Amino acid sequence: MSRRHRAEKREINPDPKFGDVVITKFMNAIMFDGKKSVAERIVYGALDVVEGKVKTDPVALFHQALENVAPHIEVRSRRVGGATYQVPVDVRPDRRQALAIRWLIKAARGRNETAMIDRLSGELVDAANNRGTAVKKREDVHRMAEANRAFSHYRW
């Protein structure tokens, strides 16, 4: 793998319904085998269900859910003199968003409702209210970083 050039970030077009780039990223993460229309149906369907349940702006609730799931600090492995330490480091903003999206989708897929639309809408509402599996994942990551605070001077 060449270290000469850093890959440049691709520009992502906003989604057609809400005009939001983050929703497009979320759709792309949900998509399997390039089936964008299926992913669109799932995301838009889930946001419609959320709007029906909570009676608030679904895009605002979606962003609130992402913010509640995004980690501020995480641990990374660092080898020092034969020992491997879990060193807490701050999470870059782009990685925060990517992790939040990934954890939300994984949590939604792990739920036991029948349709993905229902699972995703349920997880979004839970995450917006600081409940659910995705928020628990963030809490676990933060707890791990807190437990390893003693090694924070190994930061690089």
From Swiss-Prot:
Keywords: Ribonucleoprotein, Ribosomal protein, RNA-binding, rRNA-binding, tRNA-binding
A GO biological process held by the record: translation
Entry's Gene Ontology molecular function annotations: rRNA binding; structural constituent of ribosome; tRNA binding
Cellular component GO terms, alphabetical: small ribosomal subunit
Short name of one Pfam family: Ribosomal_S7
This protein's record includes keyword rRNA-binding: yes
InterPro entries: Ribosomal_uS7, Ribosomal_uS7_bac/org-type, Ribosomal_uS7_CS, Ribosomal_uS7_dom, Ribosomal_uS7_dom_sf
Assembly information from the UniProt record: Part of the 30S ribosomal subunit. Contacts proteins S9 and S11.
Family from the record: Belongs to the universal ribosomal protein uS7 family.
Biological role: One of the primary rRNA binding proteins, it binds directly to 16S rRNA where it nucleates assembly of the head domain of the 30S subunit. Is located at the subunit interface close to the decoding center, probably blocks exit of the E-site tRNA.
Protein name: Small ribosomal subunit protein uS7A/uS7B
Organism: Bartonella bacilliformis (strain ATCC 35685 / KC583 / Herrer 020/F12,63)
Lineage: Bacteria, Pseudomonadati, Pseudomonadota, Alphaproteobacteria, Hyphomicrobiales
Gene designation per UniProt: rpsG1
